[in-house]
């Protein structure tokens, strides 16, 4: 679950919904949204992620919002004076994946001031992203996307690198002969086949290379 505490702008909630659905998440929980709920401005900025908004649940307290969860993380951009383990978004995502069927949630604070300590106390662990120490500010949807993407990519099997080719068919012999003729003309024009005694063997070798391919 993605839990937004005291979200101020409907537009931000909509962008959070968009970030969530990008990564396959739909459980959005709102604690005391400032402008009430539902909010038409959220739908406008969700860019089609209305499913998340329609299923969003509203709570009066953070305690109510996390009451059914087994594992809760609190996000913050600064150190807090409390004894809690601090993990990176990557580690948090791995731990959420590892607990399997248990219910997990991530807390995000208000846009202007972040999260109060009384809310962080409810979390099992704190998540701090290792960003530029001189500037760690993220907007709400950026913070959600950062965590959601780390969770999503652990179950994604997309290769890290690939060359995508258009649909092709094997070349006909006629097409291969035309290719050879064009290639040999170009090689001749650049002097690559200038040694007449070696030319037949070189042409034969070049054709064999393409025929094997």
List where the protein language model places each region.
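Post-transcriptional modification and biogenesis factors for structured RNAs
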Residues: 1-213
């Amino acid at each position: 679950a993605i839990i937004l505490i005291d979200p101020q702008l409907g537009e931000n909630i909509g962008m959070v919904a968009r970030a969530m659905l990008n990564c396959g998440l739909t459980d959005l929980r709102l604690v005391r949204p400032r402008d009430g709920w539902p909010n038409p401005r959220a739908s406008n900025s969700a860019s089609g992620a209305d499913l998340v908004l329609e299923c969003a649940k509203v709570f009066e307290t953070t305690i109510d919002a996390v009451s059914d969860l087994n594992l809760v993380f609190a996000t913050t951009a600064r150190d807090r004076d409390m004894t809690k383990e601090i993990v990176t978004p990557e580690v948090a995502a791995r731990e959420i994946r590892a607990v399997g069927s248990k219910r997990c949630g991530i807390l995000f604070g208000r846009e202007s001031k972040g999260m109060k300590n009384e809310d962080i106390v409810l979390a099992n662990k704190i998540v701090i992203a290792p960003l530029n120490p001189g500037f760690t500010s993220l907007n709400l949807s950026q913070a959600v996307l950062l965590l959601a993407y780390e969770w999503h990519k652990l179950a994604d099997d997309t290769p890290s690198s690939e060359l995508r080719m258009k649909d092709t068919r094997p070349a006909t012999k006629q097409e291969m002969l035309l290719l050879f003729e064009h290639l040999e003309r170009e090689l001749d024009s650049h002097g690559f086949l200038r040694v007449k005694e070696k030319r037949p063997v070189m042409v034969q070798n070049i054709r064999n290379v393409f025929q094997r391919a």
